[in-house]
């Protein structure tokens, strides 16, 4: 049984993925009291798995370069970049959406003024406005993008919306939904050949859980 390395996004998706792994009998005992550890042995009679926790944007890199065979990461991260791997499963967890949001006075029509859009996801925002035939100025922000329209930095924002509470608390409204997103499983292309049996087993078992 070949060793399979899984890169898992820290935080919210981590907890949901571990629940799925438990259901298919992957050994997650070391993850219950992980402290500062980053690598975990999840081996048992059914699986030979090594799991490590990384930031969302790094999951793709680990998988693309073969340091991880499998990755669990949000679709938002995948949409923003263009890296080489297989996207094999929608895990149906971590559901939220991309949306255009602004102060209630904002009008989406182009008008004469070029709109300024604040976002952590410039590639996704660029593609969204390209499809609308709109020329906008994108302002990349790493922190709380909701602040952009409030202080006059931007006319609107493109961001992830889960409950909408943060928008409401800051006086913003959703102007338009862009797309639904959720957690995905990705696989290194070479690993799919060299560790095919082990990886297919994990994919099939996780698929069965998702369908239930």
From Swiss-Prot:
BP term (GO), one: L-histidine biosynthetic process
Subunit structure, as described in the record = Heteromultimer composed of HisG and HisZ subunits.
Q: Which PANTHER family does its entry note?
A: ATP PHOSPHORIBOSYLTRANSFERASE (PTHR21403:SF8), ATP PHOSPHORIBOSYLTRANSFERASE ATP-PRTASE (PTHR21403)
Disulphide bond pairs = none
Kindly report, in one word, the top-level EC class recorded for this enzyme. transferase
- UniProt gene name: hisG
Cross-referenced InterPro entries: ATP_PRibTrfase_cat, ATP_PRibTrfase_CS, ATP_PRibTrfase_HisG, ATP_PRibTrfase_HisG_short
The EC code for this enzyme is 2.4.2.17
The name of this protein is ATP phosphoribosyltransferase
The record's domain comment reads: Lacks the C-terminal regulatory region which is replaced by HisZ.
| Record lineage | Bacteria, Bacillati, Bacillota, Clostridia, Eubacteriales
Any GO MF annotation of the entry = ATP phosphoribosyltransferase activity
* Pathway in which this enzyme or protein is active: Amino-acid biosynthesis; L-histidine biosynthesis; L-histidine from 5-phospho-alpha-D-ribose 1-diphosphate: step 1/9
Which organism's genome codes for this protein? Answer: Clostridium botulinum (strain Langeland / NCTC 10281 / Type F)
- GO CC terms in record: cytoplasm
* Major site of localization recorded for this protein: cytoplasm
Q: Which SUPFAM superfamilies match?
A: Periplasmic binding protein-like II (SSF53850)
Question: Which family is this protein grouped under?
Answer: Belongs to the ATP phosphoribosyltransferase family. Short subfamily.
């Amino acid at each position: 049984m070949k060793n399979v390395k899984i890169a898992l996004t820290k935080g919210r998706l981590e907890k949901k993925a571990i629940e799925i792994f438990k259901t298919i009998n992957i050994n997650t005992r070391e993850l219950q009291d992980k402290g500062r550890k980053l690598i975990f042995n999840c081996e048992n009679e059914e699986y030979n798995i090594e799991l490590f926790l990384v930031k969302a944007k790094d999951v793709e890199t680990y998988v693309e370069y073969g340091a991880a065979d499998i990755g669990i990461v949000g679709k938002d991260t995948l949409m923003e970049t263009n890296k080489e791997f297989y996207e094999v499963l929608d895990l149906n967890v971590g559901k939220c959406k991309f949306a255009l949001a602004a102060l209630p006075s904002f009008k989406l029509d182009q008008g004469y003024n070029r709109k300024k859009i604040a976002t952590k996801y410039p590639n996704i925002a660029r593609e969204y406005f390209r499809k609308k035939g709109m020329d906008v100025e994108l302002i990349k922000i790493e922190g709380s993008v909701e602040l952009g329209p409030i202080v006059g930095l931007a006319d609107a924002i493109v961001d992830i919306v889960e409950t909408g509470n943060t928008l409401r608390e800051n006086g913003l409204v959703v102007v338009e939904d862009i797309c639904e997103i959720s957690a995905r499983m990705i696989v290194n292309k070479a690993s799919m050949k060299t560790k095919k049996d082990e990886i297919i087993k994990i994919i099939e078992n996780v698929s069965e859980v998702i369908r239930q």
